[in-house]
Amino acid sequence: FTRLYWGLRGRKFMYPGRKDTVKACIYVKELVCFMLYRLEHHEQGVELYNCTFEPAYTIEQIVATMNKVTGLNRTAPLIPAWILMPAAAVIGCLGAPMGICPARVRKLMVSTNICGKKLADSGYHFHYTFEEAIADWFKDNDNQYLK
């Protein structure tokens, strides 16, 4: 979420096409805790897990949490896809070093809504809520910025 933080902080973040895009995620410290848990409670065979908070969060919920935890209190406009995609194509053709191109914009508008129900039902107890994860990440950076 580092790019999101800097985009919000610099007032450069806009919702690309919609606010309800689901972005499944997990805090890296939580992932490590879960992996250690599975090593201790491993049954025979191979098990696959989608490691994500369950239910997954929308970009609007992620932005609201980022604002709350970091104290940014930024609003972000919604740019309709019919405006954003052609603009991204033009910016991409100009070779502007903004990291904006149609493929990246499309990726931002597509939900990564993977199901974390198996992890949630595994007996593992999360150490962090989503809000606590963002707060811990921010604290690790002296409550000043995110690296």
What are these regions (language model features)?
Residues 37-100, 134-147:
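Mid/C-terminal beta-alpha module of Rossmann-like enzyme folds, strongest
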Residues 28-36, 131-135:
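Short, amphipathic alpha-helical "lid/cap" segments that border enzyme active or binding sites
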Residues 19, 24-32, 41-42, 48, ...:
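Conserved loop-to-helix N-cap of the C-terminal "lid" that shapes the substrate pocket in Rossmann-like
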Residues 20-21, 52, 109, 114:
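A conserved catalytic-core signature of glycosyltransferases
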Residues 28, 64, 87-125:
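Conserved C-terminal active-site "lid" loop/helix of NAD(P)H-dependent oxidoreductases
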Residues 74, 126-127:
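Residue-level detector of short coil/turn "hinge" positions at structural boundaries
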Residues 1-33, 66:
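NAD(P)-dependent short-chain dehydrogenase/reductase
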Residues 1-2, 60, 113-116:
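Short, surface-exposed alpha-helical segments at coil->helix boundaries
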